[in-house]
Amino acid sequence: MLRWTVHLEGGPRRVNHAAVAVGHRVYSFGGYCSGEDYETLRQIDVHIFNAVSLRWTKLPPVRPAVRGQAPVVPYMRYGHSTVLIDDTVFLWGGRNDTEGACNVLYAFDVNTHKWSTPRVSGTVPGARDGHSACVLGKIMYIFGGYEQLADCFSNDIHKLDTSTMTWTLVCTKGNPARWRDFHSATMLGNHMYVFGGRADRFGPFHSNNEIYCNRIRVFDTRTEAWLDCPHTPVLPEGRRSHSAFGYNGELYIFGGYNARLNRHFHDLWKFNPGSFTWKKIEPKGKGPCPRRRQCCCIVGDKIVLFGGTSPSPEEGLGDEFDLIDHSDLHILDFSPSLKTLCKLAVIQYNLDQSCLPHDIRWELNAMTTNSNISRPIVSSHG
């Protein structure tokens, strides 16, 4: 019984950030926030959400080991990717308005909170943003995005073997997925499932004739071939900047945006790779408002969703150029316990808590007390 169980405000106000779950914690890296100074080059920030205490913390800036020497830290960026392999978060790609796009690989140790730049070899992908990254074993797969130097969309697949730190441009077989950015790629078993994103009628080149494909594409990592997929009768609307995650062997997508329809979404869809069918899911409880550019991470049987941007609710500010960046966080529970359901009832009906054990009262307080590290709301345009 899927249910939205937690909604808290006051976290990091971010869009186009990247995040990974490490145990019961979620690490969020960078992103964009309207009103912040992006002309000054500065370190990427790291926020950590504790899924037990439901609190956010922010790591302090990295100090140089040698006075006068800049520390090895990625610059603040958006449209990048992060994956977790063992105890290391690998951050790749992304851009900011001063430095442009980046193709340097960064490694973040979740135990020491230290950054490094591993020495890599092979065919390094060109600098880009809006790509996807997913993991199979020790290998990170990068697909698509918008390449800065070529000034075009990509449909290449690169893989990084983190045991040897070797990049490889995959020579794929079959009919490849269309050039795109801000799509999703999710690894289920040995297959990478690509959905959505922004493409163009002129192929790799951006002409403002956007296409939002809603057919899923599947890449087999064993044969390195794009598979021919059957048509499905029920499909979600095409979209970009949505979230996707795998749970119990199935693929889920949430939210996103379609510029041709000028519509933000807050729907949840489930894809079954066995039957190759989509189903719209209607969780219980109050979920997030329509949005794009948010992050989703799996923590046990829960999905932690935070950030993103939505149309301003103010009158006359409804189009895509008037957006409000979010500092909220929502938790979607795939299997809420009886204890969780009882706590939700206490909150909903404002029941007396004085007779409850201290730990239950602490948990109720955590579920209803907002964080306080977000910036003030500023309307963004774009």
From Swiss-Prot:
Annotated signal peptide: none
Gene Ontology CC entries for this record: chromatin; Cul2-RING ubiquitin ligase complex; cytoplasm
Pathway named in the protein's UniProt entry: Protein modification; protein ubiquitination
Cellular compartment(s): Cytoplasm
Record flagged with keyword Cytoplasm: yes
Organism: Rattus norvegicus
Subunit structure: Component of a CRL2(KLHDC3) complex, also named ECS(KLHDC3) complex, composed of CUL2, Elongin BC (ELOB and ELOC), RBX1 and substrate-specific adapter KLHDC3. May form oligomers as a KLHDC3-ELOB-ELOC complex; this interaction is likely autoinhibitory for the E3 ligase complex.
GO molecular function: chromatin binding; ubiquitin-like ligase-substrate adaptor activity
Domain of life: Eukaryota
Protein name: Kelch domain-containing protein 3
Pfam family, one: Kelch_KLHDC2_KLHL20_DRC7
This protein's record includes keyword Cytoplasm: yes
Swiss-Prot/TrEMBL Kelch repeat ranges: 25-77, 88-138, 139-189, 191-249, 251-301
Alphabetic keyword roster: Cytoplasm, Kelch repeat, Meiosis, Repeat, Ubl conjugation pathway
Encoding gene, per UniProt annotation: Klhdc3
Cysteine-cysteine disulfides: none
Function: Substrate-recognition component of a Cul2-RING (CRL2) E3 ubiquitin-protein ligase complex of the DesCEND (destruction via C-end degrons) pathway, which recognizes a C-degron located at the extreme C terminus of target proteins, leading to their ubiquitination and degradation. The C-degron recognized by the DesCEND pathway is usually a motif of less than ten residues and can be present in full-length proteins, truncated proteins or proteolytically cleaved forms.
A GO biological-process term: ubiquitin-dependent protein catabolic process via the C-end degron rule pathway
